Structure formats: C-alpha cells, structure tokens
C-alpha cells in the first residue's frame, strides 16, 4: 500500500492507451489542479494552444506553481513524479481560470487536461488555503446556488465547446461539489458527453439544489469517494447515498488531504464504512443545518466565519499554526452567541484544529474549559 505519490512510481510506466483513466488518476489530476498555473497555462478566453508538461518545466515562473504552502513539498513531488512517468509526462493543459473575490466570498478555479489517449479531464480546484475559500464550503448550505457553482456550469459549457470527444469531470473538496453541480445543470448536449463525474471528498447538496438540477440523469455516473473519517465530504450528504469509503493513513480532518489516501495497485484501499463517532457528528451537523431556514443559515455561517476570522488569520495554515493565539481570539468571539450555535461551531473549530495535531487539539479542549470557567467566574 502507498499513496498517490507511490502510485506514480509503480503505475507510471503504463500509458493511458494501455490502461485507461481510473479513480486514482482522477485524484492525481484533481490535486494537480491545485497548482498555481496563473500566467503559465492559457486562460479560458485566450484561444491559445494547450501547453505541455515540458513547457511548465522550462517556464521562468515554474516555482510559482508551488505557492500553496500547505502542499509545497508534496505538490513538488507530485509534479516531479508526473513529469518522470510515461503516464503523465505527455499531459497537456488549457483553459485555466482562477478567480478570488473576498467581498463576494467566492473562490473559483478550473483547468482542462488533455491525456495521451485522446481523452479529456475537466478539473475544478477545491478549497484553497484561504479562509474565504473555506467559508464557501459552508455557503453551500444555502438553498440558492453559490457564485462558484454558477461559474462551474459556464466553464464546463465553454470548455466542452472546444473539443468534440467524451470527457471526464471531477474535483477534490469543493471542486467535487462544483463538478457534480456543473454536470447536472449544464446543457443536455454537453451532459450526454460526460463519461464519469468524480467527487473526491466533496460536499453534497441541499435537497432543493438536487431537485432543481437534473441529478437523476447523471447519478449513475457520479463516483463519490470519501475517507473513513470524512467531515467535508459528508457535509449535506446522506448516509443512505452511494459513496465509496477509503482508508487513510491519517486521522480526523487531516484525512481530507489527498496525499493521505491509501492506494493498492490502481485503486484506493476500501474501508467498510465511516467511523461511528464521525458518522454521528456528520448526521448531527447535517440535521441541524437542514432544520434551519435561510435567515438562520446566514446567521450560522456568518457567526462561524466571524469566530474563525477573529484570529486575524488569512489562511487555515495561519489559523492552526499559532493555535494558542487563535484559540484565545476564537473564545472571545463566542460572546453573544446562543448556546446551540456556539456548541455546533465549537465542534467545527475543534475539527479544524485537528490540523494542528492531536497534542494541540487536547490543549485546545483544556484551554476552552479554562476560558469558559474564567468567563463564568467573571459573571
């Protein structure tokens, strides 16, 4: 067993003509879509030819590809592994788009990959390291589509007009949600050409969003893959829905990281089901969200954002790096919240702090109790 990095070493000698795209290839491409292609890969409206892996490798701004601090080392290894493999070294890419609008609370990015066997994969980037991108995951709880979802449909239809072949579509995290949303809401002539739709630990949808779209038409082509302790992928997802649960070498929210998913040969290592404790938390959070009206959801998401933003961190890495400082700011920001909202946000924030490690998480719980006791004594 290994990870997608080991997969590139062990399976990289096979071309796509010899072995067609599989679930692991999909995750490789979705993670590759996180690279910062700005100024290197042509944009969706530039009418320029696709660029090759060799072009990326010789570009003067190559180092900017790895600007995402969270995954700089692993993304560099991914890139090197792809470049050295027969499977991905011939990859070409085009139609890159990257939009970040803090005021509109939206972050949208996508790129189209052209494979050696003539197949095409449209990949939507997931939540990046910004707090704004993370908030958009929770904005999916609204009954109306978010700006990123609307853009995902437009991008799909624009990109699909440039080639005639059937194609794959997918994404990790929020990108998985965008891929499914675009597939069920695009024009019928585009929808008919989609082979498989991959959602790698992507959030689900409110029932109203599914009903407005043509989800039933694409349901048989959707492949949803989640780690066995999924939080993000089970947001607005029913445990009765069809999804594949896979093993991860990590724990908690850290399992959202694609580099922790275990691979055996050309497929993920299957797990029996989601962990019981996580399943209970997922169900509790979803039931609570779905019980709220639009105004209450706005209040909850804004409160969650305000609590996390109180740390003055711009990225999740900043938020978890100095967890003691963040925790103090977060607890102060809890003043004024009603008990039920505060309790639910506390669970989510503790899950975020899993990124800081088990020792930090225990310290956070202890600190939370201390701060809570201090607050009671002052009253």
Kindly give the residue locations of the regions a language model identified.
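Gly/Ala-rich beta-loop-alpha elbow adjacent to hydrolase catalytic centers
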Residues: 170-175, 179
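Alpha/beta hydrolase fold serine-hydrolase catalytic domain that processes acyl esters and thioesters
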Residues: 1-24, 29-111, 115-120, 124-141, ...
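Short glycine-enriched nucleophile-adjacent loop
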Residues: 179-188
């Amino acid at each position: 067993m290994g990870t997608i990095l080991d997969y590139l070493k062990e399976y990289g000698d096979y071309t796509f003509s010899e072995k067609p795209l599989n679930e692991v290839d999909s995750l490789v491409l979705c993670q590759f879509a996180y690279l910062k292609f700005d100024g290197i890969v042509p944009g969706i409206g530039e009418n320029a030819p696709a660029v090759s892996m060799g072009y990326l490798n010789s570009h003067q701004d190559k180092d900017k590809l790895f600007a995402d601090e969270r995954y700089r080392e692993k993304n560099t290894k991914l890139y090197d592994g792809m470049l050295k493999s027969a499977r991905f070294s011939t990859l070409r890419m085009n139609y890159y788009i990257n939009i970040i609008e803090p005021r509109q609370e939206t972050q949208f990015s996508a790129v189209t990959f052209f494979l050696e066997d003539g197949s095409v994969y449209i990949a939507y980037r997931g939540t990046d390291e910004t707090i704004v991108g993370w908030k958009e995951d929770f904005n999916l709880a609204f009954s109306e589509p978010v700006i990123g979802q609307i853009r995902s449909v437009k991008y799909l239809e624009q990109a699909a007009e440039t080639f005639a072949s059937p194609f794959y579509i997918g994404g990790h995290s929020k990108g998985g949600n965008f891929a499914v949303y675009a597939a069920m809401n695009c024009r019928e002539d585009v929808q008919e050409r989609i082979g498989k739709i991959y959602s790698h630990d992507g959030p689900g949808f409110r029932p109203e969003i599914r009903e407005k779209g043509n989800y039933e038409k694409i349901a048989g082509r959707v492949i949803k893959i989640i780690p066995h302790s999924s939080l993000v992928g089970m947001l607005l997802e029913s445990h009765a829905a069809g999804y594949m649960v896979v093993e991860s070498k990590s724990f908690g929210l850290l399992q959202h990281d694609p580099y922790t998913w275990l691979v055996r040969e050309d497929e993920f290592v299957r797990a029996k089901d989601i962990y019981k404790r996580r399943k209970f938390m997922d169900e509790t959070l979803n039931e609570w969200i779905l019980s709220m009206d639009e105004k209450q959801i706005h209040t909850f998401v804004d409160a969650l954002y305000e609590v996390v933003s109180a740390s003055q961190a711009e990225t999740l890495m900043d938020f978890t790096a100095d967890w003691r400082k963040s925790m103090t700011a977060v607890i102060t920001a809890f003043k004024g919240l009603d008990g039920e909202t505060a309790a639910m946000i506390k669970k989510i924030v503790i899950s975020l702090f899993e990124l800081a490690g088990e020792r930090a998480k225990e310290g956070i719980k202890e600190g939370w109790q201390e701060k809570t006791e201090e607050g009671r004594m002052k009253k």
